[in-house]
Amino acid sequence: MVDVAIENGHALVTIDNPPVNPLSVSVRQGLMDAVRRVNEAKCETAAIVCAGRTFVAGGDISEFAGPPPLPHLPDVLDAIEASPTPFIAVMHGTVLGGGLELALACAWRIADEKTRFGLPEVNLGLIPGAGGTQRLPRVIGLERAARMAANGKPVNTKTFEEFGGLDLVFSGDPTQALAAFRAALPARPVNTSDRSVENADLTALKAEIAKSAKGADAPMIALETTALAATLPFAEGSKIERQTHLELRASAQSRALRRLFFASRSVTRPDRLKAFTPAAINHVVIVGGGLMGAGIAAASLAAGHRVTILERDTESAEAGRGRVEAIIAKDLESGRITESKAEARRASLSAGANYAAAFDADIAIEAVFEDPEVKRAVFAELAAVMSETALIATNTSYLDPNLISEGMPGPGRFLGLHFFSPANIMKLVEVVGTSATADQSMATAFAFARGLGKIPVETGVCDGFIGNRILSAYRRQADYMVADGASPYEVDKAMRKLGMPLGPYELQDRTGLQISWANRKRQLAAGTWPGRYVDI
């Protein structure tokens, strides 16, 4: 997993641990051996590169459940930093967590112009554990480092270079960039751990993190640990960081977040579907240009698809187009996309009222009103013009996809794809197979959702599937509290205090009351209402 090649007094240390080159125990041991070989050879420089699509993207999370095996990462990084041979980190892809800690232990850092850098440990209920909170402020300053450690968000190459974190930015061949850097090698800088840190007022940042953490412990701990770099020697600060990191590994929050991390990856590729090659998706049709349909359309455009919005009349279709263009404009205004990307998305969007426009679509998703007969009518229109190999999906929140697709030609292509609003932002997509849905169709649907940057989860046919089934129980208990005398404002406040980003009534106000109201009426009429009826 770690190869060392020495030529003309220069060493090339290559990490090859696909898919994201995590710092597993074998990689750590390989790096220790590499340092020893480089020292013995008295190399002039040693460069660390990674095979594949990225530099080291973190530690091996699977090791976090038990005692960390030797060698420990802090010891590896200390050995790299203390080596008589200066190391150069040659980076591309994502340099995250232990990967950034590795780079910070090197004398110099050079990176491809499209690289991203971050300390995302807080997203797993942790803080860095190999000097990240102590070395980073010694390179880019205390406030910037504290922000990166506490919010867990990566920064791009341009930003990290402006922070002072890079010695060279390159585009193209990293081998040529490394050769050019070595040819004009600057004097070796002071080791990162030996640098001082200027103190900074973190009061505003603490208030910001306290507000955004919403009950999570790790963000504030990461900030406070990073702040130690301004008052303690590196060795003392690193010792506290390591001890805190190990304590957090055993915390309930971190265990839960790590479980979620692994679960959210395993569910996106069901084992039984791995034998199927997903069909290519080029043209996406969305029937219904309301809030949900516009969000799905925007997500599809962002993924590079051609999108057509179909509505009941031209006026409604143009209104749907306007909603999608508003999302594109907001992304442009916020800097998430460039003008050229915005224009490309607008050019890939069309809208109309003629179902004939769906004749060459690879997938159509209906996002119309939550009424089974309305949805069946849409399915019939789509089935009449689309290829029998194209997917036809319902975005229903509660209804049985079997009933919506019953009697339609080509039953193997029908399924449910339930997005959550706003669909251009929310990650979860429930993939609901009918009794007749083909595994090939399911494989294509999963691949399509992954391509949108979503987390697709297979669910069986039941009222509300997974997300709304949970939400219904949550909302039902909230309604009982209101019926017993609490106000909706009090319920919302209590849930926000618990850590929810929104209370149940705020959430309903934002997403709309129609679907919930229609569902309660449907359940009451069918005699399936699961509790006492609340007339609000």
Predicted features along the sequence, with ranges:
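Short, active-site-adjacent cap segments at secondary-structure transitions
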Residues: 53-57, 96-97, 399-400
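A short alpha->beta transition loop at the rim of the catalytic pocket in nucleotide-sugar-dependent
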Residues: 107
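Solvent-exposed beta-strand sheet faces enriched in polar/charged residues
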Residues: 49, 90, 118-120, 352, ...
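A structural preference for short, pocket-lining loop segments at secondary-structure junctions
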Residues: 8-16, 26-67, 78-92, 112-116, ...
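Long, basic N-terminal domains or extensions that often function
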Residues: 100
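Extreme N-terminal starter segment of soluble prokaryotic enzymes
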Residues: 2-3
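N-terminal glycine-rich phosphate-binding loop for ADP-containing cofactors
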Residues: 16, 28, 43, 67-72, ...
